[in-house]
Amino acid sequence: MISSLLSRSSIARRAVRGFASTAVQLDASAKLNKPARFAQPISASDIPKGFVVSSTYAGIKAAISPKPADPNTSASTAAASNPNPKPDLALIVSTVPAAAAGTFTRNVFKAAPVVVSNQVLLDGAKKEQGARVQTVLVNSGCANAVTGTQGMQDAESCVELVKKHLAPHPGLAQSSEGRETLLLSTGVIGVPLPMPTIKRCIPHLANGMILRSDPESWRETARAFMTTDTFPKLRAKTFKLGGKEVRMIGIDKGAGMIHPAMTGPAVPSAVSSGQLHATMLGLIATDAAVQPKALQVALNRAVSRSFNCISVDGDMSTNDTIILLANGQSAASSSTAVANEIDESSPDFEPFVSELTAFCQELSKLIVRDGEGAEKFVEITCTNAPSYTVAHGLLSRLVTSMLFKCAIHGQDANWGRILASVGGADPSLTKDVDASKVSVSFVDPTGEFESITVLRDGNPVKVDEDEIGKLLTKEDIKVVIDLQNGKEDCTYWTCDLSREYIEINADYRS
């Protein structure tokens, strides 16, 4: 009799939760409208001085699609059905050679553009003036990854084409020093770039007449980064260093194949595959004057607390790259002047790192917000850990747990999945975790609902299922894991796993 009543009670709870979940999902569908909520305009006054951009539609994905063209559809008819296609090829140019830094995927199967860009920064670091770059070429639709010798040749051809066709632009420095080009590619893996298409479009992009630096041009450039993204991820801001105004602008993309673990430029033998986790790409440009070595240190620190702390589906891309350019034009008296550069000993270095880190976190969280099919945004903090490495490693394990992500999607406070995942991490991470000290809480970042502790000092806490159920209906949810065994902390950002994620990735190449 008792077991029968318990069974009926369980069925009733599931039914109520099911009705509530359906209602919330319908409500979420109406509210999610990510482009309207997160695609923000930028102010012209926040655009860094000395950078110009151009973009165009090349038809890259259409050129490599395995889906045969409809013989009954003419080219003119196809064009008419999509009169304003999304750009898929873009050029970002600094009017003077800019200090450059980058972080790149640790995936063993690094894409050709990653290898080429990594080498440019390595070679530049050996020079007296450090790594200097003037242009970045971006394409979406084709990753140029796992494409063998042909892929490397195509990447190098892109660099040469940009050098050849970059027309003189008003104020564009013509010195041969520092006129290097970096590459960013995203899209389908295992297919070569459609070089006839690329060769046709680069001269157009490099034409000084269309290189501009207005908000709309930057927005179109951000759209050129997009694959399964639902909105262009573009942000810009102005801040002060040493009492002087400097500007920073950033573009990133990503919605799937997101679990970066990037490192700075390194020779292949010096980088392990790490934790093998659509590609995450990012470009940040500032008119602050920062010495290249210091710029790389700043980017490494910022990325470790931002882009390397996000996950959508646990898969590391072959193409993950973040590029940072600093051209020093904020304090320039002319288009070719470069102010004294900040180094690691400068009083402005730590403030710059702080501003950069906050900016990277803002950009990286947009990727999670736009996670393929995502309906929930989850912030997870591991506090009082013995080291940052331990905290980061435990969270990196948790955010790849399909059971945890499904529970979040279903608004089910099944906190046992959190502990099962964290506890199953590598022994090198868990050896200093004392299960009898761990506490877990669910938090509403908006403050509408009170925080609810479900585990305290290793012991479960009886909670009101209705109250925690209400908290989990929120779009934004925070989970706090307190190890009570140190002073370090780490925060990760992830999303739920929905049916739409499967639908998107089942049809990715078509």
UniProtKB/Swiss-Prot annotation:
Question: What Gene3D superfamilies does the record tag this protein with?
Answer: arginine biosynthesis bifunctional protein suprefamily, ArgJ beta chain, C-terminal domain, L-amino peptidase D-ALA esterase/amidase
Give, as one word, the top-level EC class. transferase
Give yes or no: UniProt keyword Amino-acid biosynthesis. yes
Q: What is its EC number?
A: 2.3.1.35, 2.3.1.1
The record describes its post-translational modification as: The alpha and beta chains are autoproteolytically processed from a single precursor protein within the mitochondrion.
Query: Could you say which residues are annotated as the site Cleavage?
Result: A278, T279
* Residues bound to substrate: T227, K253, T279, E372, N505, S510
Q: Offer a single GO CC term for the protein.
A: mitochondrial matrix
Principal location class:
mitochondrion
Q: Which residues form the active site?
A: T279
InterPro entries from the UniProt entry = Arg_biosynth_ArgJ, ArgJ-like_dom_sf, ArgJ_beta_C
The subcellular localization recorded is: Mitochondrion matrix
Entry keyword Amino-acid biosynthesis: yes
Of which family is this protein a member?
Answer: Belongs to the ArgJ family.
Which NCBIfam families does the record associate with it?
ArgJ, PRK05388.1
What PANTHER family does this protein map onto? ARGININE BIOSYNTHESIS BIFUNCTIONAL PROTEIN ARGJ, ARGININE BIOSYNTHESIS BIFUNCTIONAL PROTEIN ARGJ, MITOCHONDRIAL
Q: What else is known?
A: This protein may be expected to contain an N-terminal transit peptide but none has been predicted.
**Protein's recorded name:** Arginine biosynthesis bifunctional protein ArgJ, mitochondrial
Q: Which organism is it from?
A: Mycosarcoma maydis (Corn smut fungus)
